[in-house]
Amino acid sequence: MENFSLYLPTFYEFGRGSVDKVGSLTTAMGCSRVLIVYGRAHAKTSGLIDRVESALRHSAIEYDELGGVQPNPVDTLVRQGIALARDRHIEGIIAVGGGSVIDTAKAIAAGVPYKGDFWDFYGGGKTITEALPVGVVLTIAAAGSEGSGNSVITNVATRQKLGARTASILRPRFSIIDPALTVSLPPYHTACGITDMMAHILERYFSPTADVEVTDRLAEGLLMAIIDEAPKGMASPDNYQARANITWASTMAHNGILGCGRVEDWTSHAMEHEISALYDVAHGAGLAVVFPAWLTFMVDHKPAKVAQLGRRIFAIDIADDRLAAIETVARLKAFFKVVLGMPSTFAELGIAEPDIDAMVRGLHKVKGEMVGGYYKLNSSDTRSIYRMML
């Protein structure tokens, strides 16, 4: 295990009816005027925005709205939000939605006090040193952005999907997590979210760092809980307890605890970002295609950890690492495909003729000649992995 620093400043309010506390939590955040950021329609039509605004009014907090966040959120709306926040003297951002909404809110929060272009933090190598405070009302269990200091935005002009990472500055000051708000999600979006949270765990699990048994076991336990609870949540969307377990697993998957003292990988996320930047596919669906392909490559290059995963979460009883790894990949692919209904190929993502050369170029332009923490991949390797998705 390596040395590490950990700071988790987010206050979590979890459970039924917790939305009604948004006013008092915003007051505690030190804000008297906020910008409410949300998606295209559901938060409005469901009455959730009305509930949030009622709670804010009850606490004498003024607010403005910015709707229209789309999956794979874009820089153009962030720029609109920054201008609005500056014009209206906004003191904080309240994100009502899932990862795309939260990431947009974080980007706006970082951009308001910055004198330059906010994209400098994503594609220009600039470090975020200050931001408006962000609060969250979560509606989708998936990205884990409600507990992380990260944000991912797509640049429409350059067709780049890039992230900004901070240890604490972009972490929400509070996150309201009411699993009942996820009940109305369509099954496909629930499945995409489950895939995403599992990928967040696996990106940290596949590490070259030795002697990390505590975080290995935490990761394995979360994966086993998700694998147990996901079928219940998919079969009965109104199963509150299944939703509660899935939602909390999503937060735990990406709040930083699982990465303590270990090198992380993140190749699969980077490869998926190239796909969704070019073709605008759902992030979770893209990961369902990418991660098994990456694992398949590892079967012949570094199978031991893949085998360990299968033995511990799927009870695979095969002594040979390579053979155990093959079975692990098959079990994971079956879970994504059969239980969650996720795609497994480019064609099933709706991409008839994927531009693999463009993906490889984009990936290595951002990440450098060699990619990955668990196993270093060159452009020939990543091209091979993309071709496994055909």
What is each model feature region?
Residues 1-92, 346:
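ATP/NTP phosphate-donor binding region
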